Amino acid sequence: MCEMSEEYRESAPKGPPPPRLGTGDQKCVKCKEGLPVVVIRAGDAFCRDCFKALYVHKFRAMLGKSRLIFPGEKVLLAWSGGPSSSSMVWQVLEGLSRDSAKRLRFVPGVVYIDEGAACGQSPEDRARTLAEVKLALQTTGFPWHAVALEEVFSLPPSALRCSAQEAAGTEGAYKAAVDSFLQQQHALGTNGVERQSQHCAQDPQSPTGPPTTAQTQALSRLFDSVKTLTAKEELLQTLRTHLILHVARNHGYSKVMTGDSCTRLAIKLMTSLALGRGAFLAWDTGFSDERHGDVVVVRPMREHTLKEVAFYNRLFAVPSICTPALDTKAPEKASIHRLMEAFILRLQAQFPSTVSTVYRTSEKLVKAPRAGCAAGPRCLLCMCTLDVDTADSATAFGAQTSHLPQMQTPVTQARAAAGPCCCAGMGGAPGCCKREDPRAQVMEQLCYGCRVNMKDLPSLELLPPYILSEAQLRSQRATAEQEIREYLLGDSEDEAGTGES
């Protein structure tokens, strides 16, 4: 029997709790002398100096072992103001300083994309943020370019064309370039790098002024018309990439650095799988992305986790600017990106090897087309090769492709039934009156992932003009090639004719 006078709760201990064993005597796991200030993983406690050495070594090793960036090459740093990209700019800034043991040999520049109109910021908030951005960029001493996202409405269609890529240099070519660069710097004197950096810093900045009211309204209408947050984030990423590449080409940059961290790439890998972009994971998450031809995107921060970035920025006072994004204050299930982010971070909190496992899996992906599949056309938006067998209707891509010819408006069907082209017998171009449905014209030039996102955009006419113009140009080129295909000589016929002669 229970008695009312019984007390089942133990009395609270008096005095301070006993100290944990080993915390006072714990030393840095690397130098075994300094007091640890950072615990990256369980049991990995580093002092301030050893943590900085590890952090810098990861960044330098990622650039050094790839040997993609040659000495004297112009590299554009894509800076968003966030922790990872700010840390990347800080690493480059320290790597170019005179006190650095192994100095970086490329010529950097910084680009910032103002996305305030897409995120719903007021003009006053955008002006305040832009003033902070310009002040932060001026302190770096690098040439900088602050561009508004509205500039996508003035891009030329050539921004979506993959230019010819130079052949990758061999190890001997890289060593020869290093020797030539060192000899040049020795001839210029000890301050050769500073002179080159100062000359680059004196280059005029982007002359783009504030966006026009019409451009801002067009961008707002575009993002307001998108139904889901997932499609908005994908569209924003696509337009941002196009604008950065356009700035890089206009100012002579052959490489673009992004601040994607290990944690962010793990989330991106899972998100891309959910969005149907599994065929392009090697380009979306790898160290280098060569899909754009003359401009290569590199990710030197892919070995750093968000935890390491946060600790480094805190310990060494790396400045950053916090700006609202599309998913700011959005619930967990508002988009696939937010859902995957919450899923990965929750798993990482319970199982600390989650991010590293997903990240190491992405390193095993190979950038190669399928066997027997020649390099075909590229996606209009993401610029990836459409390496999918469209004849296989068992796949979602094949099923969508088979229905595209049936997507015709009543106007198109009426024109087709009206008879031959009006200009066919008057010296005009055959089929000039034949106009496809603009939506079908764009959709047939997209990969599966981009098609899924474009379904949430009711009208494609709200897209920037350069996308619609390039889609129309590609469609006309494909039609012309189809009409003259029977008059072209194939490779086998050409060789046979040469042998007979």
From Swiss-Prot:
The modification Phosphoserine is found at residue 492. Disulfide bonds: none annotated. It is found in: Cytoplasm. It comes from the Eukaryota. It holds the Pfam family CTU2. The keyword Phosphoprotein applies. Transmembrane segments: none annotated. One of its GO terms (cellular component) is cytosol. Pathway: tRNA modification; 5-methoxycarbonylmethyl-2-thiouridine-tRNA biosynthesis. Keywords: Acetylation, Cytoplasm, Phosphoprotein, tRNA processing. The modification N-acetylcysteine is found at residue 2. Residues 1-12 have a biased composition (Basic and acidic residues). GO terms for molecular function: nucleotidyltransferase activity; sulfurtransferase activity; tRNA binding. GO terms for biological process: protein urmylation; tRNA thio-modification; tRNA wobble position uridine thiolation; tRNA wobble uridine modification. InterPro entries: CTU2 (IPR019407), Rossmann-like_a/b/a_fold (IPR014729). Residues 1-23, 192-214 are annotated as: Disordered. The keyword Cytoplasm applies. Component of a complex at least composed of URM1, CTU2/NCS2 and CTU1/ATPBD3. Plays a central role in 2-thiolation of mcm(5)S(2)U at tRNA wobble positions of tRNA(Lys), tRNA(Glu) and tRNA(Gln). May act by forming a heterodimer with CTU1/ATPBD3 that ligates sulfur from thiocarboxylated URM1 onto the uridine of tRNAs at wobble position. Belongs to the CTU2/NCS2 family. This is Cytoplasmic tRNA 2-thiolation protein 2. It comes from Bos taurus. The lineage of its organism: Eukaryota, Metazoa, Chordata, Craniata, Vertebrata.
